[in-house]
Amino acid sequence: LFGVLCRDPTMMDIELMANAWYNIVWLDLEHTPKPVDEVIRLGRAISHLGMVSVVRIPELSRTHVQLLLDGGIEVIVLPDLRNADQARRFVQLGKYPPIGRRGFSSTTARAGFATGDDQEGLLRSANAATRLLVMFESDQAYEELDDILSVDGVDMVTFGGNDWAVGIDLFGDQ
């Protein structure tokens, strides 16, 4: 799989990435002041062009998680995760029951703008299609890694080497 992290992409950039056979486009809300509605529009274009939309949120908040997932974003990244309690909160916000407690609306892209007759199946399908990625960037998170990995509903884990290096005064040391 090939992907790219984009700080400030345009719709044309997204189309060029699709033509270049990228699989994943990672949009950044942690270090880029892009409006959420614009990120959702870009995410929909990414998905419609056959790529996977990934968005790193600036902080753990219901507003960011709910709006992005309802808008059709496929992978949400939580940066600077510190412990399993934060991971559990992320899952509660990002997954529907029985895994989490995400709020449900039938007027969303992810729900196909309708619930249909099989609402339980819709929730199962949405949970299966939604990926929650946690990013650890500190010694504290590393020390609690086993507890974090045991949280049901956390789908992927990565680390942020730059912030971690800054946090332990190693940035720039080679």
Language-model features: locations:
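Conserved N-terminal beta1-alpha1 strand-loop-helix module at the mouth
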Residues: L1-S53, I57-L60, Q92, L132, ...
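Generic hydrophobic/aromatic pocket-lining and core-packing "Φ" positions
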Residues: I14-E15, V39, G43, V65, ...
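Glycine/Thr-rich beta-alpha phosphate-binding loop at enzyme active sites
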Residues: M17, F159-Q174
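Non-catalytic positions within long, well-ordered alpha-helices that form the structural scaffold/packing
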Residues: A18-N19, L69, L149-S150
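Alpha-helix N-cap and loop-to-helix initiation/capping positions
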Residues: K34, R82, D173-Q174
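Conserved anion-binding
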Residues: T63, V75-D152, G161-V166
